[in-house]
């Protein structure tokens, strides 16, 4: 089949599988961030999202909270202006972005595997795996599909650069990465991937890439810390948020193994878990660590550029999701095994 046929199939399959979810209503933080948030009801309020958080309190009349998600809130406002408070269109936007992400995954693997069948299969796993359910179906977590969309767009642009990295292409890549950061701070993963790729495979691009990415990150820091004065928040009800660095590191093998286990056998999924490993033993530390090392070594032996990028992505991603990250909330989250 031709490339366009595979892309069309991904789009059709995605719409077919997620069609019923379009008719779900607003739940949880959807109401707080959209329905009960007057800032999302007027397009003129979009600049306020770059100077504050995602919630609203009438007492202070400004965006409040611990999350810095200006692009997601701007998207909510745009949808609200076009369609009102009908949740169908919010779900539709989130699902279409997720389908686009699956197409990006297909294009990424196709770039290195030089075939269509296997990349198509891998993109379907990304598209349909239940572990992605919260990121795709919970409107308040639209930031997950957004940061991945812009990060992947930037990465694919960099990977498709041939001999010359023009100023225009560099600017577009940097802009997409900035949008990824404005979607969620986890967009820093794609900055790391871009640097790793350039450092290892395209050293001739290193200086312009480092300069542009540093400038991008500085702009983000200015908006987040200088303008919005947003620090990283914590979830006080989560034991992991109160744990020491050593305790977090002790939990890392068990958490990573739990993600892998859930990916292979996604049964009885829950939004968040709050267990912790308090005592080191074979079952909760040494065995998971051994399995992870074996898998990593196997991946190293079967080295490929796509495998390296995927491995680096997961290493960086788990560094943000697992215990050593200072803002860690729950021990295990459905959000973001892939995204």
Protein language model regions, located:
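Polytopic membrane enzymes that build or remodel cell-surface glycoconjugates and lipids
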Residues: 1-339
């Amino acid at each position: 089949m031709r490339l366009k046929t595979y892309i069309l199939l991904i789009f059709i399959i995605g719409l077919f599988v997620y069609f019923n979810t379009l008719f779900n209503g607003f739940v949880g933080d959807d109401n707080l961030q959209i329905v009960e948030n007057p800032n999302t009801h007027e397009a003129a309020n979009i600049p306020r999202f770059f100077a504050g958080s995602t919630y609203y309190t009438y007492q202070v009349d400004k965006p409040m909270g611990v999350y810095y998600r200006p692009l997601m809130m701007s998207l909510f406002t745009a949808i609200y202006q076009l369609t009102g408070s009908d949740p169908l269109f919010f779900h539709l936007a989130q699902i279409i972005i997720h389908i686009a992400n699956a197409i990006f995954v297909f294009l990424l693997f196709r770039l290195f595997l030089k075939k269509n069948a296997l990349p198509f299969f891998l993109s379907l796993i990304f598209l349909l795996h239940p572990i992605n359910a919260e990121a795709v179906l919970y409107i308040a977590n639209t930031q997950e599909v957004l940061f991945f969309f812009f990060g992947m767009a930037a990465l694919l642009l960099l990977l498709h650069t041939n001999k010359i990295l023009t100023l225009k292409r560099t600017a577009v890549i940097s802009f997409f990465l900035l949008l990824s950061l404005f979607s969620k701070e986890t967009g820093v993963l794609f900055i790391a991937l871009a640097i790793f790729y350039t450092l290892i495979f395209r050293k001739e691009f290193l200086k312009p890439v480092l300069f542009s990415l540093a400038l991008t990150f500085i702009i983000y820091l200015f908006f987040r810390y200088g303008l919005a004065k947003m620090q990283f928040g914590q979830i006080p009800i989560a034991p992991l948020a109160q744990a020491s660095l050593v305790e977090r590191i002790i939990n890392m093998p068990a958490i990573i193994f739990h993600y892998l286990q859930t990916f292979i056998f996604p049964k009885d999924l829950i939004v968040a878990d709050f267990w912790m490993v308090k005592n080191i033993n074979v079952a909760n530390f040494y065995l998971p660590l051994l399995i992870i090392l074996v898998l990593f070594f196997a991946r190293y032996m079967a080295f490929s550029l796509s495998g390296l990028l995927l491995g680096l992505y997961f290493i960086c991603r788990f560094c943000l999701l697992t215990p050593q990250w200072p803002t860690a909330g729950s021990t295990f989250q459905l959000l973001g095994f892939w995204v």
